[in-house]
Amino acid sequence: MRSQRIVHIVSCHAEGEVGDVIVGGVAAPPGATLWEQSRWIARDQDLRNFVLNEPRGGVFRHANLLVPAKDPRAQMGWIIMEPADTPPMSGSNSLCVATVLLDSGILPMREPLTRLLLEAPGGLIEARAECRDGKAERVEIRNVPSFADRLDAWIEVEGLGSLQVDTAYGGDSFVIADARRLGFALRADEAAELVATGLKITHAANEQLGFRHPTNPDWDHLSFCQLAAPPERRDGVLGANNAVVIRPGKIDRSPCGTGCSARMAVLQAKGQLRVGERFVGRSIIGSEFHCHIESLTELGGRPAILPCLSGRAWITGIHQYLLDPDDPWPQGYRLSDTWPGGHC
């Protein structure tokens, strides 16, 4: 068997969302900070294409590159690669990374509780893993500072007319719209229509509202549309279903950790969620993230929250991605039957 490249991957999913972890075969990219390293990955595209494009990947897949942390307090760093973006942070991917680090023995597991400090491109996060019999059974993430940006703003959306939305940041940037007002029950059989609607809303919100992170001027767009049900209480606990539409055209199978963080920032800003109060985010496949606001803070002089979310992740496979020197598609390919806007 011959190959001019071997990339070692542990496959994982967190509450339904795939987050593969690259554990070997790739050198850390250039950059003085983890953010600079992630920008190099985003510009270069070589690794992104190799692991995310067909025949090795697909639009449903995310990949996470383990790298040495730049912050001396952190035990590991990682760079997130989503189908269209290389974002500051991801909740489901952080759960996959923490689980792979512990379940595979890359970092030592201490039962019943292991604490990790990890560095994402968007900042430090703390992971607290409940562990038993060699398995990280549930991981809680203390996320980066999150904030509401625009509340109850109006936009004009093609085919939908005037629509009231919120925008917020939870480690990534979101426009949040009321799914019920758009006629959605947030069922799995609505997935294709949810994607089409969400992409229209994201496009309109970027054009008409825009977004700029207060301390990271590089992050100047809205990434996702969160189509969310109104919050309601079950057994006294506030929660809501959602479908987060990810470019170029898929739905997050998990409840979306950065999306739940952004939603909690909006709910707190509107006086609907208190510090310490539980919030349950539910996905289109019925999986859950259990969340709360740990404390209030500020970011770049604006009010913010420190959100926490917890969920489960499971390793699904171990792979070695190879590249035969005669393979005519070393960067892979994307076709629009499954990858919107894709081309060979």
UniProtKB/Swiss-Prot annotation:
Protein induction: Is up-regulated when the bacterium is grown on trans-4-hydroxy-L-proline (t4LHyp) or trans-3-hydroxy-L-proline (t3LHyp) as sole carbon source.
Keywords for the protein's UniProt record, in alphabetical order: Isomerase, Lyase
GO MF annotation list: 4-hydroxyproline epimerase activity; trans-L-3-hydroxyproline dehydratase activity
Catalytic residues identified in the record: S90 (proton acceptor)
EC identifiers of the protein: 5.1.1.-, 4.2.1.77
Entry binding sites for substrate: G91, S92, D252, G257, T258
Catalytically driven reaction(s): trans-3-hydroxy-L-proline = 1-pyrroline-2-carboxylate + H2O; trans-3-hydroxy-L-proline = cis-3-hydroxy-D-proline
A Pfam family that the UniProt record links to this protein: Pro_racemase
Annotated function: Bifunctional enzyme catalyzing both the dehydration of trans-3-hydroxy-L-proline (t3LHyp) to Delta(1)-pyrroline-2-carboxylate (Pyr2C) and 2-epimerization of t3LHyp to cis-3-hydroxy-D-proline (c3DHyp). No dehydratase activity with L-proline, trans-4-hydroxy-L-proline (t4LHyp), cis-4-hydroxy-L-proline (c4LHyp), D-proline, cis-4-hydroxy-D-proline (c4DHyp), trans-4-hydroxy-D-proline (t4DHyp) or L-serine as substrates. Displays neither t4LHyp epimerase nor proline racemase activity.
Entry's family note: Belongs to the proline racemase family.
Protein name, per record: Bifunctional trans-3-hydroxy-L-proline dehydratase/2-epimerase
Organism: Pseudomonas aeruginosa (strain ATCC 15692 / DSM 22644 / CIP 104116 / JCM 14847 / LMG 12228 / 1C / PRS 101 / PAO1)
